[in-house]
Protein backbone atom coordinates (compact mmCIF):
# COMPACT_ATOMS: atom_id res chain seq x y z
CA UNK A 1 0.00 0.00 0.00
CA UNK A 2 1.26 3.48 -0.79
CA UNK A 3 1.58 4.69 2.79
CA UNK A 4 4.81 6.25 4.00
CA UNK A 5 6.59 4.11 6.55
CA UNK A 6 6.46 5.46 10.06
CA UNK A 7 9.30 7.82 10.91
CA UNK A 8 10.31 6.49 14.33
CA UNK A 9 10.49 9.13 17.06
CA UNK A 10 13.48 8.90 19.39
CA UNK A 11 11.19 7.75 22.21
CA UNK A 12 9.63 4.95 20.15
CA UNK A 13 13.06 3.88 18.94
CA UNK A 14 14.32 3.78 22.53
CA UNK A 15 11.32 1.69 23.63
CA UNK A 16 11.73 -0.84 20.84
CA UNK A 17 15.47 -1.22 21.45
CA UNK A 18 15.14 -1.99 25.16
CA UNK A 19 15.89 -5.58 26.21
CA UNK A 20 12.68 -5.54 28.24
CA UNK A 21 10.62 -4.91 25.08
CA UNK A 22 9.95 -8.54 24.27
CA UNK A 23 9.64 -8.98 20.51
CA UNK A 24 7.45 -11.47 18.67
CA UNK A 25 6.93 -13.91 21.54
CA UNK A 26 5.34 -17.25 20.71
CA UNK A 27 1.88 -18.21 21.94
CA UNK A 28 3.41 -20.40 24.65
CA UNK A 29 5.78 -17.65 25.79
CA UNK A 30 2.84 -15.23 26.03
CA UNK A 31 0.80 -17.81 27.97
CA UNK A 32 3.60 -17.95 30.57
CA UNK A 33 3.73 -14.15 30.77
CA UNK A 34 -0.07 -13.87 31.09
CA UNK A 35 -0.12 -16.39 33.93
CA UNK A 36 2.95 -14.94 35.69
CA UNK A 37 1.45 -11.43 35.50
CA UNK A 38 -1.98 -12.61 36.73
CA UNK A 39 -3.54 -11.16 33.58
CA UNK A 40 -5.78 -14.16 32.87
CA UNK A 41 -6.82 -17.68 33.80
CA UNK A 42 -6.41 -20.95 31.96
CA UNK A 43 -9.61 -22.78 30.98
CA UNK A 44 -10.21 -26.47 30.36
CA UNK A 45 -10.65 -25.69 26.64
CA UNK A 46 -7.02 -24.54 26.51
CA UNK A 47 -8.00 -20.89 26.00
CA UNK A 48 -7.00 -18.01 28.27
CA UNK A 49 -9.84 -16.02 29.85
CA UNK A 50 -9.05 -12.35 30.53
CA UNK A 51 -11.09 -9.60 32.14
CA UNK A 52 -11.27 -6.22 30.42
CA UNK A 53 -12.13 -4.53 33.72
CA UNK A 54 -14.34 -1.46 33.76
CA UNK A 55 -14.87 -1.30 29.99
CA UNK A 56 -16.44 -4.39 28.40
CA UNK A 57 -16.95 -2.75 25.01
CA UNK A 58 -15.66 0.05 22.83
CA UNK A 59 -15.65 3.65 24.09
CA UNK A 60 -16.92 5.57 21.02
CA UNK A 61 -17.20 8.88 22.89
CA UNK A 62 -13.48 8.71 23.64
CA UNK A 63 -12.31 8.16 20.06
CA UNK A 64 -10.58 11.02 18.24
CA UNK A 65 -8.81 11.78 14.97
CA UNK A 66 -5.98 14.32 15.00
CA UNK A 67 -6.76 17.40 12.91
CA UNK A 68 -3.82 17.96 10.59
CA UNK A 69 -3.77 20.17 7.46
CA UNK A 70 -2.77 17.36 5.08
CA UNK A 71 -6.05 15.49 5.47
CA UNK A 72 -8.46 17.39 7.73
CA UNK A 73 -10.72 18.27 4.78
CA UNK A 74 -11.14 14.57 3.95
CA UNK A 75 -12.54 13.53 7.34
CA UNK A 76 -16.28 13.41 7.97
CA UNK A 77 -16.15 15.22 11.31
CA UNK A 78 -18.91 14.76 13.87
CA UNK A 79 -19.90 12.64 16.85
CA UNK A 80 -18.13 9.58 15.40
CA UNK A 81 -14.97 11.30 14.11
CA UNK A 82 -14.19 13.79 16.86
CA UNK A 83 -11.31 16.22 16.30
CA UNK A 84 -8.32 16.66 18.59
CA UNK A 85 -5.49 19.06 17.73
CA UNK A 86 -1.98 17.87 16.93
CA UNK A 87 -0.26 19.58 19.86
CA UNK A 88 -2.67 17.99 22.36
CA UNK A 89 -2.08 14.59 20.78
CA UNK A 90 1.72 14.92 20.79
CA UNK A 91 1.78 15.98 24.44
CA UNK A 92 -0.32 12.98 25.46
CA UNK A 93 1.67 10.67 23.19
CA UNK A 94 4.90 11.78 24.87
CA UNK A 95 3.43 11.16 28.34
CA UNK A 96 2.28 7.66 27.37
CA UNK A 97 5.71 6.77 25.96
CA UNK A 98 7.37 8.02 29.17
CA UNK A 99 4.93 5.89 31.17
CA UNK A 100 5.69 2.79 29.10
CA UNK A 101 9.43 3.42 29.37
CA UNK A 102 9.15 2.82 33.13
CA UNK A 103 7.49 -0.59 32.73
CA UNK A 104 9.44 -3.75 33.60
CA UNK A 105 8.37 -5.37 30.34
CA UNK A 106 6.59 -4.48 27.13
CA UNK A 107 5.34 -6.82 24.40
CA UNK A 108 5.93 -6.03 20.73
CA UNK A 109 4.36 -7.66 17.67
CA UNK A 110 5.04 -6.96 14.00
CA UNK A 111 2.47 -8.11 11.48
CA UNK A 112 0.08 -7.07 8.74
CA UNK A 113 -3.45 -5.88 8.06
CA UNK A 114 -4.73 -7.04 4.67
CA UNK A 115 -4.17 -10.44 3.07
CA UNK A 116 -3.60 -8.94 -0.40
CA UNK A 117 0.02 -7.79 -0.60
CA UNK A 118 -0.85 -4.97 -3.02
CA UNK A 119 -2.88 -3.26 -0.30
CA UNK A 120 -1.26 -4.60 2.87
CA UNK A 121 -0.58 -2.38 5.87
CA UNK A 122 2.55 -3.21 7.88
CA UNK A 123 2.03 -2.93 11.63
CA UNK A 124 3.94 -2.64 14.87
CA UNK A 125 1.91 -3.19 18.04
CA UNK A 126 3.39 -2.16 21.41
CA UNK A 127 1.48 -3.53 24.40
CA UNK A 128 1.61 -2.97 28.13
CA UNK A 129 -0.29 -6.24 28.67
CA UNK A 130 0.83 -9.67 27.46
CA UNK A 131 -2.71 -10.85 26.75
CA UNK A 132 -3.28 -7.81 24.53
CA UNK A 133 -0.20 -8.83 22.55
CA UNK A 134 -1.60 -12.34 22.05
CA UNK A 135 -4.90 -10.74 21.00
CA UNK A 136 -3.01 -8.68 18.40
CA UNK A 137 -1.24 -11.80 17.12
CA UNK A 138 -4.60 -13.55 16.82
CA UNK A 139 -6.44 -10.71 15.09
CA UNK A 140 -3.83 -9.40 12.68
CA UNK A 141 -1.87 -11.41 10.10
CA UNK A 142 1.24 -13.09 11.47
CA UNK A 143 4.52 -13.15 9.53
CA UNK A 144 5.80 -16.63 8.70
CA UNK A 145 8.91 -16.23 10.84
CA UNK A 146 10.51 -14.04 13.48
CA UNK A 147 13.11 -13.06 10.89
CA UNK A 148 10.38 -11.79 8.54
CA UNK A 149 8.81 -9.90 11.44
CA UNK A 150 12.10 -8.22 12.32
CA UNK A 151 12.38 -6.86 8.76
CA UNK A 152 8.95 -5.18 8.82
CA UNK A 153 9.11 -1.40 8.62
CA UNK A 154 5.65 -0.41 9.84
CA UNK A 155 3.23 1.87 8.02
CA UNK A 156 1.26 2.19 11.27
CA UNK A 157 2.03 1.69 14.96
CA UNK A 158 -0.42 0.87 17.75
CA UNK A 159 0.69 2.04 21.19
CA UNK A 160 -1.55 0.49 23.86
CA UNK A 161 -1.25 1.54 27.52
CA UNK A 162 -4.49 0.44 29.20
CA UNK A 163 -3.36 1.30 32.74
CA UNK A 164 -2.41 4.86 31.80
CA UNK A 165 -5.28 7.16 32.78
CA UNK A 166 -5.65 10.50 31.07
CA UNK A 167 -6.52 13.68 32.95
CA UNK A 168 -9.23 15.31 30.79
CA UNK A 169 -8.50 18.84 32.05
CA UNK A 170 -4.81 18.55 31.23
CA UNK A 171 -4.79 16.07 28.32
CA UNK A 172 -7.75 17.36 26.29
CA UNK A 173 -9.71 14.09 26.43
CA UNK A 174 -13.29 13.55 27.57
CA UNK A 175 -12.41 10.96 30.22
CA UNK A 176 -9.51 8.83 31.44
CA UNK A 177 -9.93 6.75 28.27
CA UNK A 178 -8.69 7.68 24.79
CA UNK A 179 -8.36 6.13 21.35
CA UNK A 180 -6.59 8.61 19.06
CA UNK A 181 -5.70 8.10 15.40
CA UNK A 182 -3.07 10.27 13.72
CA UNK A 183 -2.71 9.70 9.99
CA UNK A 184 0.25 12.08 9.85
CA UNK A 185 2.17 10.30 12.62
CA UNK A 186 0.89 6.87 11.52
CA UNK A 187 -0.14 6.04 15.08
CA UNK A 188 -3.09 4.73 17.06
CA UNK A 189 -2.70 5.75 20.71
CA UNK A 190 -4.86 3.83 23.21
CA UNK A 191 -5.08 4.33 26.97
CA UNK A 192 -7.40 3.98 29.93
CA UNK A 193 -9.22 0.89 28.65
CA UNK A 194 -8.38 -2.81 28.72
CA UNK A 195 -10.94 -3.63 26.02
CA UNK A 196 -8.72 -5.24 23.38
CA UNK A 197 -11.23 -4.69 20.57
CA UNK A 198 -10.10 -1.05 20.40
CA UNK A 199 -6.92 -2.23 18.61
CA UNK A 200 -8.85 -4.27 16.05
CA UNK A 201 -11.38 -1.55 15.31
CA UNK A 202 -8.71 1.15 15.36
CA UNK A 203 -6.90 -0.50 12.46
CA UNK A 204 -10.24 -1.07 10.69
CA UNK A 205 -10.93 2.68 10.95
CA UNK A 206 -7.46 3.35 9.50
CA UNK A 207 -8.11 0.98 6.58
CA UNK A 208 -11.52 2.61 6.05
CA UNK A 209 -9.61 5.82 5.37
CA UNK A 210 -6.57 4.57 3.46
CA UNK A 211 -8.28 2.10 1.11
CA UNK A 212 -11.13 4.28 -0.25
CA UNK A 213 -8.67 7.14 -0.77
CA UNK A 214 -7.05 4.79 -3.32
CA UNK A 215 -10.48 3.85 -4.73
CA UNK A 216 -10.40 0.48 -2.98
CA UNK A 217 -13.59 -0.54 -1.20
CA UNK A 218 -13.43 -1.32 2.52
CA UNK A 219 -16.34 -3.21 4.05
CA UNK A 220 -17.76 -4.34 7.39
CA UNK A 221 -18.95 -7.74 6.19
CA UNK A 222 -18.28 -11.48 6.22
CA UNK A 223 -17.28 -13.35 3.05
CA UNK A 224 -17.19 -16.93 1.81
CA UNK A 225 -16.45 -18.81 -1.39
CA UNK A 226 -17.93 -21.90 -3.05
CA UNK A 227 -16.22 -24.83 -4.76
CA UNK A 228 -16.51 -23.09 -8.14
CA UNK A 229 -14.85 -19.91 -6.88
CA UNK A 230 -18.13 -18.01 -6.52
CA UNK A 231 -17.80 -15.37 -3.79
CA UNK A 232 -20.54 -14.00 -1.53
CA UNK A 233 -20.46 -11.02 0.84
CA UNK A 234 -22.75 -10.70 3.87
CA UNK A 235 -23.45 -7.27 5.34
CA UNK A 236 -25.52 -6.99 8.49
CA UNK A 237 -25.65 -5.48 11.96
CA UNK A 238 -25.63 -7.42 15.22
CA UNK A 239 -28.40 -10.01 15.49
CA UNK A 240 -29.13 -10.30 11.77
CA UNK A 241 -27.49 -13.71 11.29
CA UNK A 242 -24.30 -12.63 9.48
CA UNK A 243 -22.04 -15.14 11.27
CA UNK A 244 -24.58 -17.97 11.13
CA UNK A 245 -25.42 -17.60 7.43
CA UNK A 246 -21.85 -17.10 6.22
CA UNK A 247 -20.70 -20.28 8.03
CA UNK A 248 -22.09 -22.70 5.44
CA UNK A 249 -20.72 -26.28 5.37
CA UNK A 250 -20.37 -26.32 1.57
CA UNK A 251 -18.51 -22.98 1.40
CA UNK A 252 -15.15 -21.83 2.71
CA UNK A 253 -14.80 -18.79 4.96
CA UNK A 254 -12.69 -15.90 3.69
CA UNK A 255 -13.30 -13.83 6.81
CA UNK A 256 -16.01 -12.97 9.31
CA UNK A 257 -15.89 -9.19 9.76
CA UNK A 258 -13.59 -6.87 7.77
CA UNK A 259 -12.76 -6.99 4.05
CA UNK A 260 -11.38 -4.96 1.19
CA UNK A 261 -12.25 -5.12 -2.50
CA UNK A 262 -9.50 -4.14 -4.94
CA UNK A 263 -8.60 -4.87 -8.57
CA UNK A 264 -7.68 -8.45 -7.63
CA UNK A 265 -10.92 -9.27 -5.79
CA UNK A 266 -11.91 -9.69 -2.14
CA UNK A 267 -9.37 -9.87 0.68
CA UNK A 268 -9.65 -10.23 4.44
CA UNK A 269 -8.19 -7.33 6.41
CA UNK A 270 -7.65 -9.56 9.44
CA UNK A 271 -5.92 -12.79 10.35
CA UNK A 272 -8.42 -13.87 12.96
CA UNK A 273 -11.98 -13.79 14.27
CA UNK A 274 -13.53 -11.92 17.20
CA UNK A 275 -16.67 -13.93 17.81
CA UNK A 276 -19.45 -13.27 20.30
CA UNK A 277 -19.36 -15.96 22.98
CA UNK A 278 -22.56 -15.35 24.94
CA UNK A 279 -24.81 -18.45 24.94
CA UNK A 280 -22.30 -20.24 22.72
CA UNK A 281 -22.86 -23.99 22.39
CA UNK A 282 -21.18 -26.75 20.43
CA UNK A 283 -24.55 -27.83 19.02
CA UNK A 284 -25.63 -24.41 17.69
CA UNK A 285 -22.29 -23.01 16.50
CA UNK A 286 -19.74 -25.84 16.28
CA UNK A 287 -17.33 -23.86 14.10
CA UNK A 288 -16.86 -21.13 16.71
CA UNK A 289 -16.96 -23.51 19.69
CA UNK A 290 -14.27 -25.75 18.21
CA UNK A 291 -12.08 -22.72 17.47
CA UNK A 292 -11.85 -22.00 21.20
CA UNK A 293 -8.69 -23.93 21.98
CA UNK A 294 -5.06 -23.38 22.92
CA UNK A 295 -4.08 -19.88 21.74
CA UNK A 296 -7.59 -18.40 21.93
CA UNK A 297 -8.31 -15.40 24.14
CA UNK A 298 -11.71 -15.34 25.86
CA UNK A 299 -12.92 -11.99 27.19
CA UNK A 300 -15.09 -11.57 30.28
CA UNK A 301 -16.49 -15.11 30.37
CA UNK A 302 -17.31 -16.75 33.71
CA UNK A 303 -14.96 -19.62 34.62
CA UNK A 304 -15.34 -21.85 37.69
CA UNK A 305 -12.56 -23.15 39.94
CA UNK A 306 -12.17 -26.23 37.72
CA UNK A 307 -11.54 -24.08 34.63
CA UNK A 308 -14.96 -24.76 33.09
CA UNK A 309 -16.40 -21.87 31.04
CA UNK A 310 -20.09 -21.02 31.46
CA UNK A 311 -20.91 -19.35 28.15
CA UNK A 312 -24.50 -18.67 29.28
CA UNK A 313 -23.42 -16.55 32.26
CA UNK A 314 -23.57 -12.81 31.50
CA UNK A 315 -22.52 -11.70 35.01
CA UNK A 316 -19.77 -9.46 33.61
CA UNK A 317 -21.33 -8.48 30.28
CA UNK A 318 -23.46 -9.65 27.37
CA UNK A 319 -20.47 -8.78 25.19
CA UNK A 320 -18.32 -11.82 25.97
CA UNK A 321 -15.90 -12.60 23.15
CA UNK A 322 -13.49 -15.15 21.73
CA UNK A 323 -10.45 -13.97 19.74
CA UNK A 324 -8.70 -16.67 17.74
CA UNK A 325 -6.53 -16.95 14.61
CA UNK A 326 -8.51 -17.86 11.51
CA UNK A 327 -6.61 -21.14 11.13
CA UNK A 328 -8.51 -22.42 14.18
CA UNK A 329 -11.38 -22.89 11.72
CA UNK A 330 -11.16 -25.89 9.38
CA UNK A 331 -13.25 -24.68 6.46
CA UNK A 332 -11.26 -21.62 5.36
CA UNK A 333 -9.36 -20.17 2.40
CA UNK A 334 -5.68 -19.37 2.95
CA UNK A 335 -4.45 -16.82 2.16
CA UNK A 336 -7.76 -15.17 3.03
CA UNK A 337 -8.68 -13.76 -0.36
CA UNK A 338 -10.72 -14.69 -3.44
CA UNK A 339 -12.05 -13.37 -6.74
CA UNK A 340 -14.59 -10.59 -7.25
CA UNK A 341 -17.96 -11.32 -5.62
CA UNK A 342 -20.87 -12.75 -7.55
CA UNK A 343 -23.44 -12.01 -4.86
CA UNK A 344 -23.95 -9.49 -2.06
CA UNK A 345 -26.44 -10.14 0.73
CA UNK A 346 -27.73 -7.29 2.92
CA UNK A 347 -29.14 -8.83 6.10
CA UNK A 348 -31.75 -7.07 8.20
CA UNK A 349 -33.84 -8.27 11.14
CA UNK A 350 -37.07 -6.35 10.53
CA UNK A 351 -39.06 -6.50 13.77
CA UNK A 352 -41.90 -4.55 12.11
CA UNK A 353 -42.67 -7.60 9.96
CA UNK A 354 -43.13 -5.71 6.69
CA UNK A 355 -39.99 -6.32 4.61
CA UNK A 356 -39.94 -9.42 2.39
CA UNK A 357 -37.77 -12.40 3.38
CA UNK A 358 -35.78 -11.92 0.17
CA UNK A 359 -35.77 -9.26 -2.55
CA UNK A 360 -33.47 -8.57 -5.48
CA UNK A 361 -32.12 -5.01 -5.53
CA UNK A 362 -31.22 -2.69 -8.37
CA UNK A 363 -27.91 -0.83 -8.08
CA UNK A 364 -29.70 2.29 -6.79
CA UNK A 365 -31.65 0.25 -4.25
CA UNK A 366 -28.43 -1.43 -3.15
CA UNK A 367 -26.79 1.95 -2.57
CA UNK A 368 -29.89 3.16 -0.69
CA UNK A 369 -29.94 0.16 1.64
CA UNK A 370 -26.16 0.25 2.06
CA UNK A 371 -26.29 3.88 3.17
CA UNK A 372 -29.28 3.16 5.42
CA UNK A 373 -27.82 0.10 7.18
CA UNK A 374 -31.16 -0.86 8.75
CA UNK A 375 -32.10 -3.38 11.40
CA UNK A 376 -34.30 -3.28 14.52
CA UNK A 377 -33.76 -3.01 18.24
CA UNK A 378 -36.07 -5.41 20.03
CA UNK A 379 -38.02 -5.09 23.26
CA UNK A 380 -35.94 -6.48 26.10
CA UNK A 381 -32.56 -6.11 24.41
CA UNK A 382 -31.98 -2.60 25.74
CA UNK A 383 -33.31 -0.88 28.83
CA UNK A 384 -36.38 1.18 28.03
CA UNK A 385 -37.14 -0.48 24.69
CA UNK A 386 -40.73 -1.76 24.83
CA UNK A 387 -41.61 -1.57 21.13
CA UNK A 388 -39.46 -2.42 18.12
CA UNK A 389 -37.25 0.51 17.14
CA UNK A 390 -35.47 1.03 13.83
CA UNK A 391 -31.69 1.11 14.06
CA UNK A 392 -29.65 2.64 11.24
CA UNK A 393 -25.86 2.24 11.01
CA UNK A 394 -24.49 3.84 7.84
CA UNK A 395 -22.83 1.32 5.50
CA UNK A 396 -23.43 -1.31 8.20
CA UNK A 397 -20.44 0.10 10.08
CA UNK A 398 -20.95 3.77 11.01
CA UNK A 399 -18.57 3.85 14.04
CA UNK A 400 -15.57 2.99 11.86
CA UNK A 401 -15.99 5.30 8.85
CA UNK A 402 -13.64 8.33 8.75
CA UNK A 403 -14.82 9.51 5.30
CA UNK A 404 -18.14 10.85 4.06
CA UNK A 405 -20.49 7.83 3.74
CA UNK A 406 -21.24 8.79 0.13
CA UNK A 407 -17.66 7.84 -0.79
CA UNK A 408 -18.26 4.23 0.28
CA UNK A 409 -21.67 4.10 -1.44
CA UNK A 410 -20.25 5.46 -4.71
CA UNK A 411 -17.44 2.88 -4.66
CA UNK A 412 -19.93 0.08 -4.03
CA UNK A 413 -22.15 1.24 -6.88
CA UNK A 414 -19.20 1.35 -9.30
CA UNK A 415 -18.07 -2.15 -8.30
CA UNK A 416 -21.58 -3.61 -8.59
CA UNK A 417 -21.75 -2.25 -12.14
CA UNK A 418 -18.23 -3.24 -13.13
CA UNK A 419 -18.49 -6.85 -11.93
CA UNK A 420 -22.21 -7.39 -12.58
CA UNK A 421 -22.91 -8.36 -8.96
CA UNK A 422 -26.34 -9.58 -7.86
CA UNK A 423 -27.51 -7.87 -4.66
CA UNK A 424 -30.26 -9.18 -2.38
CA UNK A 425 -31.97 -7.84 0.72
CA UNK A 426 -32.70 -10.69 3.14
CA UNK A 427 -34.99 -10.16 6.13
CA UNK A 428 -34.17 -12.56 8.96
CA UNK A 429 -36.72 -10.88 11.22
CA UNK A 430 -40.49 -11.14 11.47
CA UNK A 431 -43.39 -11.95 9.18
CA UNK A 432 -47.17 -11.88 9.61
CA UNK A 433 -47.01 -9.02 12.10
CA UNK A 434 -44.50 -7.06 14.11
CA UNK A 435 -42.45 -8.50 16.97
CA UNK A 436 -44.82 -9.84 19.61
CA UNK A 437 -47.59 -10.47 17.06
CA UNK A 438 -45.97 -12.14 14.04
CA UNK A 439 -43.37 -14.89 14.00
CA UNK A 440 -39.67 -15.03 13.22
CA UNK A 441 -38.88 -16.17 9.69
CA UNK A 442 -37.64 -19.74 9.90
CA UNK A 443 -33.85 -20.09 9.71
CA UNK A 444 -34.46 -23.12 7.48
CA UNK A 445 -36.25 -20.92 4.92
CA UNK A 446 -33.62 -18.16 5.20
CA UNK A 447 -30.75 -20.60 4.64
CA UNK A 448 -32.51 -22.00 1.58
CA UNK A 449 -33.22 -18.55 0.09
CA UNK A 450 -29.64 -17.38 0.67
CA UNK A 451 -28.29 -20.61 -0.81
CA UNK A 452 -30.44 -20.19 -3.93
CA UNK A 453 -29.34 -16.57 -4.33
CA UNK A 454 -25.64 -17.38 -3.94
CA UNK A 455 -25.81 -20.27 -6.40
CA UNK A 456 -27.38 -18.03 -9.04
CA UNK A 457 -30.68 -19.92 -9.01
CA UNK A 458 -32.66 -16.65 -8.84
CA UNK A 459 -31.07 -15.05 -11.92
CA UNK A 460 -33.86 -16.24 -14.20
CA UNK A 461 -36.62 -16.39 -11.60
CA UNK A 462 -39.90 -14.52 -12.02
CA UNK A 463 -40.22 -11.46 -9.79
CA UNK A 464 -43.05 -9.18 -8.78
CA UNK A 465 -42.86 -5.72 -7.18
CA UNK A 466 -44.44 -5.30 -3.77
CA UNK A 467 -46.84 -2.39 -3.51
CA UNK A 468 -45.21 -0.47 -0.64
CA UNK A 469 -41.43 -0.78 -1.00
CA UNK A 470 -41.02 -1.28 -4.74
CA UNK A 471 -38.82 -4.31 -4.07
CA UNK A 472 -38.56 -7.24 -6.52
CA UNK A 473 -39.81 -10.40 -4.80
CA UNK A 474 -39.61 -13.92 -6.29
CA UNK A 475 -43.14 -15.09 -7.14
CA UNK A 476 -42.27 -18.59 -6.00
CA UNK A 477 -39.41 -20.57 -4.53
CA UNK A 478 -39.36 -24.29 -4.00
CA UNK A 479 -39.47 -25.17 -0.26
CA UNK A 480 -40.65 -21.66 0.74
CA UNK A 481 -44.39 -21.01 1.30
CA UNK A 482 -45.78 -18.41 -1.12
CA UNK A 483 -47.58 -16.77 1.80
CA UNK A 484 -44.34 -15.44 3.27
CA UNK A 485 -42.57 -14.39 0.05
CA UNK A 486 -44.78 -11.31 -0.24
CA UNK A 487 -45.19 -9.99 3.32
CA UNK A 488 -48.65 -8.49 2.79
CA UNK A 489 -49.97 -12.02 2.25
CA UNK A 490 -48.64 -13.14 5.63
CA UNK A 491 -50.63 -10.52 7.54
CA UNK A 492 -54.23 -11.32 8.46
CA UNK A 493 -55.14 -7.63 8.06
CA UNK A 494 -53.67 -6.02 4.92
CA UNK A 495 -54.62 -2.50 6.07
CA UNK A 496 -52.57 -2.97 9.24
CA UNK A 497 -49.67 -4.17 7.09
CA UNK A 498 -49.89 -1.04 4.91
CA UNK A 499 -49.99 1.24 7.96
CA UNK A 500 -46.97 -0.48 9.49
CA UNK A 501 -45.09 -0.36 6.17
CA UNK A 502 -45.84 3.37 5.81
CA UNK A 503 -44.48 3.93 9.31
CA UNK A 504 -41.20 2.16 8.50
CA UNK A 505 -40.85 3.95 5.14
CA UNK A 506 -41.22 7.30 6.92
CA UNK A 507 -38.43 6.33 9.34
CA UNK A 508 -36.15 5.30 6.47
CA UNK A 509 -36.79 8.59 4.67
CA UNK A 510 -36.21 10.64 7.82
CA UNK A 511 -32.89 8.87 8.41
CA UNK A 512 -31.83 9.37 4.78
CA UNK A 513 -32.12 13.15 5.01
CA UNK A 514 -28.80 13.28 6.89
CA UNK A 515 -26.90 12.34 3.73
CA UNK A 516 -27.78 15.64 2.09
CA UNK A 517 -28.70 16.72 -1.45
CA UNK A 518 -25.79 14.87 -3.11
CA UNK A 519 -27.65 11.56 -2.68
CA UNK A 520 -30.96 12.88 -3.99
CA UNK A 521 -30.71 10.68 -7.09
CA UNK A 522 -30.18 7.56 -4.95
CA UNK A 523 -33.17 8.54 -2.80
CA UNK A 524 -35.33 9.06 -5.89
CA UNK A 525 -34.31 5.91 -7.78
CA UNK A 526 -33.40 3.57 -4.91
CA UNK A 527 -35.91 4.59 -2.26
CA UNK A 528 -39.26 2.95 -1.70
CA UNK A 529 -42.13 2.43 -4.12
CA UNK A 530 -40.06 3.71 -7.03
Swiss-Prot record:
It catalyses: oxaloacetate + ATP = phosphoenolpyruvate + ADP + CO2. Belongs to the phosphoenolpyruvate carboxykinase (ATP) family. Mn(2+) binds at residues 201, 220, 257. GO terms for cellular component: cytosol. Binds 1 Mn(2+) ion per subunit. This is Phosphoenolpyruvate carboxykinase (ATP). Substrate binds at residues 58, 195, 201, 321. Its main location: cytoplasm. Pathway: Carbohydrate biosynthesis; gluconeogenesis. The gene is pckA. SUPFAM superfamilies: PEP carboxykinase N-terminal domain, PEP carboxykinase-like. GO terms for biological process: gluconeogenesis. Its EC number is 4.1.1.49. Its cofactor is Mn(2+). Pfam families: PEPCK_ATP. It comes from Staphylococcus haemolyticus (strain JCSC1435). Keywords: ATP-binding, Cytoplasm, Decarboxylase, Gluconeogenesis, Lyase, Manganese, Metal-binding, Nucleotide-binding. The keyword Manganese applies. GO terms for molecular function: ATP binding; metal ion binding; phosphoenolpyruvate carboxykinase (ATP) activity.
